[in-house]
Amino acid sequence: MGRIGNIIDRKSKQDAKKAKIYTKLARVISVAAREGGGDVEYNAALKNAIDKAKLQNMPNDNIDRAIKKGTGEGGSDQYEEIVYEGYGPSGVAVIVEVLTDNRNRTAGDVRHAFDKNGGNLGSTGCVSFMFDKKGQIIIEKEDHIDEETLMMVSLEAGAEDFISEEDAYEVITSIEDFHSVKEGIEKAGYKLLEANISYIPQTLSQLQSEDDIKKMNRLIDMLEDNDDVQNVYHNWEVML
């Protein structure tokens, strides 16, 4: 299934945890509004956060409250962005993005998740060189979608690559062109499954033992269940 398998597997898990996902998205929206103001016309980070929330069907009331909280109308918490790197079972590379109001608490929680599941938390840079940070847009395959037309729309909008896999199309962009490519695809009438700035693994790693597979799944679940964790990236090839 490759990278798309990883994404669809993550999406199905997220669908079962909507309330927690909304809490995390609200935090991102609040931070973006605090740092760049509440007007999406002048705040690309806020627009991206709201677009991501809408892809998850987050209610508009929740989005509005998060913006007001960020701009100081509804109270304000101070969060910092931290990226942790480490290894899962059998050396699987893992990157964890967090937004936290307590660095020590979050570091302890993340370290505990790695330690409990056959991995270890590493130092900055220990695995990030195995990934490329890119815009990643996923469109689910449907009968009415013509692959060649979608590919041309994507490339003409500025995409770097277009990949067709079993269940979905993957469009890769530079970070700078992410918003314009995303808008170009949406304006052409395509519905997006996901659209994010992501750490994309250069190569994928397979786990051979059932024990390692269980540990890796548990590691991902423990990290994603943490309210401070925004995104978990890895180079494990999930076999669906």
From Swiss-Prot:
It is found in: Cytoplasm. One of its GO terms (cellular component) is cytosol. SUPFAM superfamilies: YebC-like. Belongs to the TACO1 family. Keywords: Cytoplasm, DNA-binding, Transcription, Transcription regulation. One of its GO terms (biological process) is regulation of DNA-templated transcription. This is Probable transcriptional regulatory protein Clos_1778. Pfam families: TACO1_YebC_N, Transcrip_reg. Its main location: cytoplasm. It comes from the Bacteria. GO terms for molecular function: DNA binding. InterPro entries: Integrase-like_N, TACO1_YebC-like_2nd/3rd_dom, TACO1_YebC_N, Transcrip_reg_TACO1-like, Transcrip_reg_TACO1-like_dom3, YebC-like.
